[in-house]
Every structure is written in structure tokens, then in C-alpha cells.
């Protein structure tokens, strides 16, 4: 039996469910999720492998109109995948009408000269008639290879989408070992899990201004716990105060919630230490962006 493989980008506006879809396909969390826009900042690879195929998904930052150097990085990071993949999944939400952001993305996709599958997510939130209207509207704007309605949260139609991708893959090599599920090191995943808890627990002004740096991560020979030292970076003193909370209560809660997820991922007991530091306007400083891990990565 021949083996098939290929690279697939997941593109769309912020908060359409790209990371939820990837996590569902992989059967575990490799991309953090939040109801805050622009949660995903880096391209994240999810490697789906069976005995018949290997689909390398690339989850991308939500495409938006950037206002900072970080925003520029995120949008360019998303569009750069068009040079690297065999197929694009263009994801839109079933419960929102087509907007200017969708039109902007489609203009780029029309020039990409690679197959584009329209994935309409969140079908569990709409009536079938509304879904049909959405399909007709998008089809009137662009010639898609296929249109697949799904619910990434509930898993509806996700197997159908995987089968469709497999049918369209070329015969090829297995690029990664069958037990590898992502290209990112554990340090990156740990930092993202901490950032996810900050997004979940803090106010609206905080999310875009937060970065997490893992200062050290090593096993303690005495306790056999993985000892992690992490710094949460913000842009203003007021944000630092919010994250620390009254008598350190918010920072403690962030640490407790993050530690549980990190222990599940690593399969080890974890001792997590967190600090908060202010780095003014880091989102507009290229050196700071690079220091915090926001640099272009080609696949």
C-alpha cells in the first residue's frame, strides 16, 4: 500500500477555531485556545500520522489588520505558509457573515495557485438554512476545491475533512517519526500554556501585551520534579499589578492552572516558579520580539 504525505495550512481571521480544530485532530492540546483575538502568535505544526498517511498541519496566527510590529510578524507568518504547503484550509465561522477580513484573505489565496478548501466551522451554532446561505455567499466570491462544514469543538465532519485531505495528497515520504506530534520544543509549549492562563484569567487590556519566557527548565535530582522558572513579560506597570493581583493571588492562580496542564503534557510532576517583568513597548521592538521567540520560521 502506498504512503501519502503533505503539508496543509490552516488560515483564517482570529477566533474562527483554527487551534480548536488542530487540537481535535491531534487528540491533545498543542495549540493554546482563548476567546481573546490573536491568541495564536507563532506558526504551530501538528503532525497527524497513521499507517497510510502523514498530514503536517500548520496552524497560523489569525489574519488581522496589524497595529504593531508583533502584529506585522503574525500576519506575515500566516501568509508565508502559502509558500510552504500543498493545500490550504481557509476557515470561516458559520455564525458570522463574510466580512472585509475574509475578502482580504481570499484575494491573497486567489493568487497563491494552490488548492483551497473552504472549511465552515461552528456549524453547531446555526440553522441549516443559514449554513447554506453562507456556503453560497463564499462560493460566489472564489472557486474552492471543496467546501466542508464542520464543528471543530464537537468533531462533526472532521473525519470527512481528513479523508478528503488524504484523497488529495500525493504519494510521498514520512517526514517525521510517527510518535512526533509537533515541531516545537517542550519549552515553547510550556510558555504557551502559561500565556493561555494569563489570557483566560485577566482583563481585556492584558492579552496582547503578554509574552512568556522560560528562563530554565530542568529536573531536580532530589525531588524528581521538573523545575521550571518562567517570566511573564508585560508593557506597563499597571499590567504587572493586574497579573500579580492582590497579595499575589492572580499570579498564584495562573501558576496553579498552568502547572496542571504542563504536568499532563510532560507526564511528570512540576514545580513552577513565575515572575512578572515590565518591558515597555516590546511589541514594537524587533530585538525584543526575537528575544521572546517571535521570528520567522520556514518549514
UniProtKB/Swiss-Prot annotation:
Query: Region G3: what ranges?
Result: 59-62
GO BP, sorted A to Z: ribosomal small subunit assembly
Chain segments annotated as transmembrane = none
Stated name of the protein: GTPase Era
Query: Which residue ranges does the record assign to the KH type-2 domain?
Result: 202-280
Lineage: superkingdom: Bacteria
Its family? Belongs to the TRAFAC class TrmE-Era-EngA-EngB-Septin-like GTPase superfamily. Era GTPase family.
State the residue spans of region: G2.
Answer: 38-42
Q: How does it assemble?
A: Monomer.
Q: Does the keyword RNA-binding apply?
A: yes
Q: Which gene encodes it?
A: era
* Alphabetical list of Pfam families matching this protein: KH_2, MMR_HSR1
Name the PANTHER family on file: GTPASE ERA, GTPASE ERA, MITOCHONDRIAL
Q: Where is this region: G5?
A: 150-152
> Which residues does the annotation say bind GTP?
12-19, 59-63, 121-124
Q: Where is this region: G1?
A: 12-19
The Gene Ontology terms for molecular function here are: GTP binding; GTPase activity; ribosomal small subunit binding; small ribosomal subunit rRNA binding
Q: Where is the Era-type G domain?
A: 4-171
